[in-house]
Every structure is written in structure tokens, then in C-alpha cells.
């Protein structure tokens, strides 16, 4: 099967309606109070590949990404995971309103997860694709394939 090429290497809040986070694996989170950012390291599924006639299971085009939420604050975590893993069911973007200074619009971003919920207020996000997607039978990369946990802001280049 030919390699999957993402439509772009840096996605933004403007692309939200064309994106989907179902079954993404969340590996790590980081709050950067100096930049007013909240970063998430996750495995993003770009495409579900239907099984061929002689196959039973789906395959998945997956790449590690860094999500950077801008002007982020009021982060709330309500997670209970027996294995410490977090699987995203969906990402919701809700309640648009002006920022306190009235210069920007902020929203609630809410990760609905199998293990609970993560929410925050932010003015937008970037999602940076760090590597070319790999075709796998599992819905996430392992630590070796994804080269560990990372909040790298550099997009992949076509390999």
C-alpha cells in the first residue's frame, strides 16, 4: 500500500471541522506558563483502512503529533486509568466567547476520553505532524516507533 501523505504538516483551529480525534492515544501533556500554552503529545489517526476481502481487521495510518493550545488556561483533568493510558473518544470545541481583554475569542476545548475528561480554555491550536504516518494494525504507535515522548514543534518533511 502506498504511503499516506497528510494534506498538511501543520493543522490549526481553522481545520477543526475536517479533523477527528477518535481513538487517538494521548501520551503526555505539558503546561508552559511562560508562553501561555498547553501542549499534548498524541498519536493521531489520519485514516482507517478497511480490510481487504481476505482480511478481518482494519489498519490505521498513524503519526505522532504535537498539539499546542494557545493562550491556554483553566486546565481541568478528570482521568482515571488503570494502566495509565489515555484514549481519546473525541475533541469538542465549545462555548466561544471574548477573552477578558476583548481582543480575541476563546473556547473550551474538551477531550472526551475513555478514561475521563481533559478540558481547557484557549484561543486556538496548532497540530504539528512530527513524522510521516505509518500503516499499523494497532491504533497507536509504541514508544520505539514514535521515538519516545516529544513536544517537538518541527513538522516532518516528506521522506
Task: Name each model feature, range by range.
Residues 1-159:
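Surface-exposed, interaction-prone regions used to assemble/regulate multi-protein complexes
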Amino acid at each position: 500500500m502506498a504511503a499516506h501523505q497528510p494534506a498538511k504538516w501543520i493543522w490549526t483551529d481553522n481545520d477543526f471541522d475536517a479533523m477527528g480525534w477518535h481513538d487517538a492515544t494521548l501520551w503526555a501533556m505539558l503546561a508552559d506558563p511562560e508562553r501561555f500554552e498547553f501542549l499534548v503529545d498524541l498519536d493521531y489517526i489520519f485514516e482507517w483502512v478497511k480490510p481487504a476481502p481476505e482480511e478481518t481487521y482494519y489498519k490505521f495510518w498513524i503519526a505522532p503529533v504535537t498539539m499546542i493550545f494557545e493562550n491556554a488556561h483553566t486546565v481541568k483533568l478528570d482521568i482515571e486509568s488503570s494502566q495509565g493510558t489515555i484514549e481519546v473518544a473525541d475533541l469538542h470545541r465549545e462555548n466561544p466567547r471574548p477573552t477578558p481583554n476583548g481582543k480575541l475569542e476563546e473556547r473550551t476545548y474538551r477531550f472526551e476520553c475513555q478514561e475521563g475528561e481533559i478540558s481547557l480554555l484557549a484561543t486556538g491550536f496548532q497540530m504539528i505532524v512530527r513524522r510521516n504516518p505509518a500503516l499499523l494494525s494497532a491504533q497507536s504507535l509504541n514508544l520505539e516507533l514514535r521515538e519516545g515522548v516529544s513536544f517537538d514543534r518541527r513538522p516532518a518533511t516528506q521522506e
